[in-house]
Structure formats: C-alpha cells, structure tokens
C-alpha cells in the first residue's frame, strides 16, 4: 500500500441488515468497490448525515424498502489492500421494515434477494458480511433441541405429558 492511501481520510459508509423468517436481504453490487459481490444494502455517507441516516437512505435507494429503528450492530475499519482502494469506516445496522415490503433492486444494486445464512456463505461476499451473518447465526436461538438433550433424555420438553 502506498503512503498516499495511508494518509487519505477514511470515508464513512453504512449498511442495513433486514431479517425476515431466517433470511437476510442482500443486494448484488453493480459498481466498485464490490462489483458482482453480494452485500447488505448500503453505501457512502453524504455530508451531514449520521451513520444511521446513511443506512436508511441507502436501503431505500437500493431496494425501495423504507427501514426504521436502526440499531448499531457492528463497525469495521476497512483498510485498503492496494493503491486504488479507499479506506472506509463501515457502520452496520439492524433495521426494521414492514414484512410486506418487496425489495426491488435499483441505484447501484444489480439484484436484490432474501437468503439463508447457508445460501449467503455460498455467494461471493465481503468478509464483513460473512462476519455479520456468523454473528447473527450465533445470536439466533436454535429451533432444534440439542443432541445432548436428545441422547440423555433430560430435556423436559421432549418428554410426553
């Protein structure tokens, strides 16, 4: 990395995570820096915008979905790995949206869709998306009883009344 890339001011960016029935909304990027990769809807901040405002604006621009109640989920310092890259400070928010809103790709999103974590891991995704989905999966309560409880027969929910 050259010294010019090191001294440039980082750009602020935000993205929005929306979960619906165990699926997460992703867009396929049409433009660099992540062209043809899948990511949460998001992008660069405009002057005077808070990170939460950026996440909601980018969500609406890229998918047509109006989000609300953004809650900071994770932050990333995305340092460039070559001279042409830009340094970003990325804020990722969990966002609420009406369940009947359809995602329609627009702006710099070439496509939009809802994906399970397993499907996401098979797609070309930035490391930040992989990390967020792994963290979300760890936070999500299991819908299956543990194998240990099944083997030992100690889980009271498994016993007949």
Where are these regions (language model features)?
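A short coil-to-beta-strand element that immediately follows conserved catalytic motifs
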Residues: 66-75
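Conserved Nudix-box catalytic region and its N-terminal flanking loop in Nudix hydrolases
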Residues: 23-61, 161
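A generic structural micro-feature
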Residues: 6-10, 37, 83-89, 106-109
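Nudix hydrolase/Nudix homology domain
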Residues: 33-38, 102-161
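Conserved N-terminal beta-strand and adjoining loop/helix that marks the start
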Residues: 2-25
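Active-site-adjacent beta-strand/loop module that shapes the phosphate/pyrophosphate-binding cleft
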Residues: 76-102, 135-136
């Amino acid at each position: 990395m050259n010294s010019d890339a090191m001294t440039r001011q980082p750009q602020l960016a935000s993205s929005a995570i929306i979960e619906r029935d165990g699926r997460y909304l992703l867009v396929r990027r049409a433009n660099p820096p992540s062209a043809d990769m899948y990511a949460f809807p998001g992008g660069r901040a405009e002057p005077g915008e808070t990170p939460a405002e950026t996440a909601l604006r980018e969500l609406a621009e890229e998918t047509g979905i109006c989000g609300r109640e953004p809650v900071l989920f994770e932050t990333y310092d995305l340092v460039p790995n070559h001279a042409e890259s830009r340094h970003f400070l990325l804020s990722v928010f969990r966002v609420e949206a009406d369940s009947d809103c359809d995602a329609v790709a627009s702006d710099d999103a070439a496509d939009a869709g809802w994906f399970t974590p397993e499907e996401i891991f098979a797609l070309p995704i930035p490391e930040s998306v992989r990390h967020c989905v792994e963290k979300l999966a760890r936070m999500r309560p299991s819908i299956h009883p543990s194998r240990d409880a099944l083997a030992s027969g100690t889980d009271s929910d498994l016993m007949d009344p």
